[in-house]
């Protein structure tokens, strides 16, 4: 087990680059170390922060508790069956690196999720998604450390209660399960999912008439994301800041009468998902700045750390965006990242 550090600077551990310190900090290199970590005097399951890539958190002030940085690495193929390859990745693996690894193996299923920041362990929590694919589509099971019993358990896909940007790990399982690895069921034969946005055109341009591959899709997704989204190493951000709101069919129809070009995505239950970025853009908020935080000038869905933003700058800007969108559309926006402490949640 690694030694505990105290008053550790967390700025390098959150992609928005907010300045905060951890009262105590320890790096986890192997899942088995969890048995020792939970017995540390600094450990309190009600206040511990399990930290991955830091791409889905907003640190509003110094963290008054233990931060466990998940650095366990490793990828292994478990089995092949009926055209599927089951691959286990440890929670500390960088998500994009893992996606590229599966693409290089000729496997299909994760290519649409290329270049999403964060770690493998965080992917089921948020049920990350992009370009018509959600990670729940390819997760077979999730291995966790159960803090109630202090044993390792394996949860099936169904056990995880996946929904849009939701899972068991954000609801009743929050504070109980520590994700240590994820098993993915990936296809040996490439089945493209190109029904979202401008992805099909980008893939066609790359493949130039030949049959497209998973690598083509991954490369196209990377190119599109790089053209729209800032690199968090250059300009601090947490990717998409707001969830795409889901409204009733009646509300969507009313809005469509006023805004005929409004993007909308009918859902199986009859509701309609709207594009948060489009709503924000219609309010002419690109480039709007409060303190050091700003709405990105090319992608309205992204808030950025433009000039040493304080936590209060980010909170005020997010609140302003939500209020402005609600005033114009009567649609509520909700933030994707987690506010820490949660009392700051919008």
Predicted regions and their residues:
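Beta-rich strand-turn-strand
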Residues: 107, 311-314
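Anion-binding (especially nucleotide phosphate/pyrophosphate-binding) glycine-rich loop
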Residues: 1-142, 146-148
């Amino acid at each position: 087990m690694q030694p505990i550090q105290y008053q550790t600077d967390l700025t390098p551990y959150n992609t928005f680059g907010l300045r905060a310190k951890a009262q105590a900090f320890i790096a986890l290199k192997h899942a088995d170390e969890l048995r020792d970590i939970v017995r540390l005097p600094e450990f309190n399951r009600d206040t511990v922060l399990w930290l991955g890539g830091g791409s889905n958190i907003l640190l509003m002030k110094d963290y008054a508790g233990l931060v466990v940085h998940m650095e366990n690495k490793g990828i292994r193929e478990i089995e092949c069956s009926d055209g599927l390859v089951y691959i286990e990745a440890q929670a500390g693996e960088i998500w994009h690196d893992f996606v590229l690894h599966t693409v290089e193996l000729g496997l299909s299923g994760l290519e649409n999720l290329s270049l999403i920041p964060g770690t493998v362990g965080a992917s089921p929590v948020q049920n990350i998604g992009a370009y018509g694919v959600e990670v729940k589509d390819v997760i077979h099971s999730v291995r966790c450390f159960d803090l109630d019993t202090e044993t390792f358990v394996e949860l099936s896909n169904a056990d995880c209660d996946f929904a849009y940007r939701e899972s068991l790990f954000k609801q009743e399982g929050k504070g109980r399960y520590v994700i240590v690895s994820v098993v993915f069921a990936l296809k040996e034969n490439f089945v493209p999912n190109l029904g979202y946005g401008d992805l099909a055109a980008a893939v066609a341009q790359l493949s130039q008439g030949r049959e497209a591959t998973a690598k083509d899709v991954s490369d196209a997704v990377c190119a599109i994301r790089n053209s729209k989204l800032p690199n968090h190493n250059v300009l601090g951000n947490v990717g998409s800041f707001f969830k795409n709101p889901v409204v009733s069919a009646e509300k969507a129809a009313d809005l469509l009468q006023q805004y005929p070009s409004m993007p909308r995505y009918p859902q199986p239950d009859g509701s309609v998902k709207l594009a948060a970025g489009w709503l924000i853009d219609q309010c002419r908020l690109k480039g709007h700045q409060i303190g050091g935080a700003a709405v990105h000038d090319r992608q309205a869905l992204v808030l950025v750390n433009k000039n040493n933003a304080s936590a209060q700058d980010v909170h005020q800007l997010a609140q302003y965006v939500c209020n402005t969108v609600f005033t114009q559309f009567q649609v509520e926006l909700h933030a994707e990242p987690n506010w820490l402490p949660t009392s700051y949640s919008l």
